[in-house]
Structures are given as structure tokens and as C-alpha cells.
């Protein structure tokens, strides 16, 4: 059985006892979390979130990109979130390569060089600070007074705040 088939079976089981169809669209805690997509990082478990509590936006590295700004704009301006939590983590795959090297390999394989930034970074703390700066510089976000950044340690499960 493929992983997808297994997950579809899990989804059927989940639906049999589903009782959350009346959750409102705006998140109850009025918070958005931007986190890395790494499978070792579970924002819901880490932060004690349940369905309906928060918007969780994930990408490679948890990097603040134009698409993250787009999602946060909708989250804040249309759905009422007022706080943002950024989470990067130790031992991140984004620490292991350089954008230009991967772009060159993709171009060699496909004949097309990606036009977008992969956003690899050499330092978790430095990239969290850059992500904070990108958020604070955005004219599109309406709530920037409650933006905090954290580095998650994949070995200990602890969060360390980055200013």
C-alpha cells in the first residue's frame, strides 16, 4: 500500500467521527504561525493548537516570502489574526545547500533554471532576523506589534526566542 492510500484510509476514519463542521473560519486564538515544513516539527503539538485555533503557514525553511506575506495579508485583514509566530529549527535542510548550486543542477537536468529564490540560509538565527525584518517592512500587514520569532531544537523540543 502506498503512503497516499494509507493516508486516505486515515482520512475516512477521521470523517466517521467528525464533529468540527461548525468551526468558524477565523482562528479562535487570532494567531498565525509561519513554520518550516520539516516533518520533525509539529506546530500543533508544539504549541498546543487544535483545529480552529490558528492559521499555520508552512514552507521550506519557514521563510517569509511574497507568498507568506500574501497569506498573512488574508489572515490579518480578512480573518482577524493579530499575532504572528515564526518558527525555524535546528538541523534544517535549508542549511545544507546554496541556491545557485541547486538551480544549476535543476537547469542541467531540465534545461530550465528556476527563476525564484530557493531561500537557503547559512544560519537559523540570522534568517529568523531577516524574516522578522521582511514582515516589519511589509506595507500589507496590519498587525506587526505582536510578531515573535523562535528557533525550535529538533533534539530537545525546546523553543528559543530570537529578537
Mark where each language-model region is.
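Ordered, amphipathic secondary-structure segments that act as subunit-interaction surfaces
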Residues: 79-89
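Gly/Ser/Thr-rich loops at beta-strand to alpha-helix junctions
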Residues: 37-40, 90-94
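Divalent-metal-activated hydrolytic enzyme cores
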Residues: 1-27, 62-67, 74, 78-79, ...
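Short beta-strand segments
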Residues: 34-36, 58, 87-89, 150-153
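Conserved beta-strand-loop surface patch within small alpha/beta domains used
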Residues: 13, 17-70
Amino acid at each position: 500500500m502506498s503512503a497516499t492510500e494509507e493516508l486516505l484510509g486515515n482520512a475516512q476514519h477521521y470523517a466517521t467521527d467528525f464533529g468540527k463542521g461548525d468551526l468558524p473560519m477565523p482562528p479562535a486564538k487570532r494567531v498565525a504561525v509561519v513554520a518550516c515544513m520539516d516533518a520533525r516539527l509539529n506546530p500543533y503539538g508544539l504549541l498546543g493548537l487544535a483545529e480552529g485555533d490558528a492559521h499555520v503557514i508552512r514552507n521550506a525553511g519557514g521563510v517569509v516570502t511574497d507568498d507568506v506575506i500574501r497569506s498573512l495579508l488574508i489572515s490579518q485583514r480578512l480573518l482577524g489574526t493579530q499575532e504572528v509566530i515564526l518558527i525555524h529549527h535546528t538541523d534544517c535542510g535549508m542549511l545544507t545547500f546554496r541556491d545557485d548550486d541547486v538551480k544549476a543542477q535543476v537547469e542541467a537536468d531540465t534545461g530550465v533554471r528556476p527563476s525564484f529564490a530557493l531561500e537557503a540560509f547559512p544560519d537559523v538565527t540570522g534568517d529568523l532576523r531577516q524574516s522578522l525584518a521582511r514582515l516589519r517592512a511589509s506595507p500589507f500587514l496590519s498587525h506587526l506589534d505582536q510578531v515573535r520569532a523562535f528557533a525550535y531544537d529538533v533534539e530537545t523540543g525546546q523553543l528559543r526566542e530570537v529578537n
